[in-house]
Amino acid sequence: MTPFQLQARYQPMGDQPTAIAQLVEQVQAGAPYQTLLGATGTGKTFTIANVIAQVGRPALVLAHNKTLAAQLCNELREFFPNNAVEYFISYYDYYQPEAYIPVTDTYIAKTASINEEIDMLRHSATRNLFERRDVIVVASISCIYGLGIPSEYLKAAIPLEVGAEINMREVLRQLVDVQYSRNDLESGRGRFRVKGDVLEIGPAYEDRIIRVEFFGDEIDAIRYIDPVTGEILQSLDRLNIYPARHFVTPEERLEIAIAEIKEELNQQLLTLQAEGKLVEAQRLEQRTRYDLEMLQEVGYCNGVENYARHLAGREPGSPPECLIDYFPKDWLLVVDESHVTVPQLRGMYNGDQSRKKVLVDHGFRLPSAADNRPLKSEEFWEKVRQCIFVSATPGDWEIERSEEQIVEQVIRPTGVVDPEVFVRPTEGQVDDLLAEIQQRVRRQERALITTLTKRMAEDLTDYLSDRGVKVRYLHSEINSIERIEILQDLRNGDFDVLIGVNLLREGLDLPEVSLVAILDADKEGFLRTERSLIQTIGRAARHINGQAILYADRMTESMEKAISETERRRRIQLDYNQRHNITPQPIIKRSSNAILSFLEVSRRLNKQELEVAVSQADDLSLEEIPNLITQLEAQMKEAAKNLEFEEAAQYRDRIKKLRERLVGRH
């Protein structure tokens, strides 16, 4: 029996039931690779949710960036509210890797800002993979980087049970061993505090506090409590406290690692000296010996990840353990937008190694630092037992691996068909486009226009704006949050036309868009390939009046294939609608987003009130500031819960400033 409980307001429709049945059958038959070739708007995520629910195995859903991962995570959480749907992306708000530029003799130290909320979600994912079967982890490509050794992480967990005889001091020692720190003034993630016979622990994997009550040398009660109100949320008989960091090194392994690092250092010094690199040798010796002292004294040093191979006891060149190694053997991989995600997997290793080689050659790191790396593409696929690729335009690599196991999903549950495609000459294209836009504006519909260059997009934006069109330009410098706000404004009718160079990125499945215009469609290249054209045309595939206009003076092979595929799908859809007497219905999609929803907007109004209070903190009494901090903490946790990490970080910074003021005034 499956541990997943799928909840949806609707049943599979169109060719979804067939697709679900085929995918489930092949997974259960042991097929290593399959491809779900699903047209835009056909409900591919719902299909995959049904497959996961029926197969009943832990699943990893891989997305090519963190914004798309957040959207998928929110969708799957709606389908599986009673199961563990986890979010695993890089926990850095900011990351500047260590680097050296030989030409200018410039060394750049690693600088990073870790987002505590994302780190908590990463720990939540690994913890649930050990404790549950009903787990779906939605991850970005960062999941192929090293993540400690699962067996050591599990071995280091501290079991606590009501009635167990254990001295509180022993529990405190164990907590310190797994990298929790004592702070009797303030609780929080990765910290613990003691009040008499009560121990409060802030686990690394959730925002609730664990309260352990002792009676002498016996555990009397274990409870979850609210970190803000102190309210008891749940009483437990037993639980495990997992380490505060994924990288856990037992003391005996640390001693062996230090000896291995010393041996490698001596060998590398001889090599550098033999090559006449005396400055590099001196630099390496000074840096490494300092790191060794830190490891011996506190078990940690800055840049400790560069010694990961020794600390983990791996062989030179062997792949690091990563998130995949935390899954059980029968796990299922789903690669979303595989035509983008699969090539990304190939590129991660090479970029990392070129930077590390320069650091090693110039005496900043030992050669073993190169083994602190992401998985190579072939190493990743060796770990995968079963995989479903999901894309409207899967790549050749995915098609070849899937062989005959390609499942097509063309019919939309709403009956909406693929857009009509027209090819028009470039002469007079701007005036023709203006007339088409004006028609859409009168019908309160929206339009997307894609150009080949940034300059052309800017000029076209100015031209249309001068003629009274409400238009915006989406360019690469806009960050994820601003981008989503612009898309929300387009949906809400604040403007009618969106222009950009690359409109293939996430978040552009907009039901209000009835026109997609592709300028210079006959210029072969990255954004005018067959797959790119199909994807771009598909942006109008959610509207009952969808049309795509390709402005070109000749018919390229890519155009011909893209138009042919779109027309093939359109014929299938029209035939299905006619046979089943279906009238296409407009997609009614609430104007919300995984990152920016109506609830988020209303919460921002409250945020403005809090901003005023923060700005006037100097005028508040000592009794009022803690209350303000409590409100901000609640807002921060709500933001993090909704995957609004940038906003959560802003709350965190304001809380920090208020605490500094509070301490200063004491």
Swiss-Prot record:
GO terms for cellular component: cytoplasm; excinuclease repair complex. Residues 429-595 form the Helicase C-terminal domain. InterPro entries: Helicase/UvrB_N (IPR006935), Helicase_ATP-bd (IPR014001), Helicase_C-like (IPR001650), P-loop_NTPase (IPR027417), UVR_dom (IPR001943), UVR_dom_sf (IPR036876), UvrB (IPR004807), UvrB_inter (IPR041471). It is found in: Cytoplasm. The UvrABC repair system catalyzes the recognition and processing of DNA lesions. A damage recognition complex composed of 2 UvrA and 2 UvrB subunits scans DNA for abnormalities. Upon binding of the UvrA(2)B(2) complex to a putative damaged site, the DNA wraps around one UvrB monomer. DNA wrap is dependent on ATP binding by UvrB and probably causes local melting of the DNA helix, facilitating insertion of UvrB beta-hairpin between the DNA strands. Then UvrB probes one DNA strand for the presence of a lesion. Forms a heterotetramer with UvrA during the search for lesions. Interacts with UvrC in an incision complex. NCBIfam families: PRK05298.1 (NF003673), uvrb (TIGR00631). This is UvrABC system protein B. It comes from Synechococcus elongatus (strain ATCC 33912 / PCC 7942 / FACHB-805) (Anacystis nidulans R2).
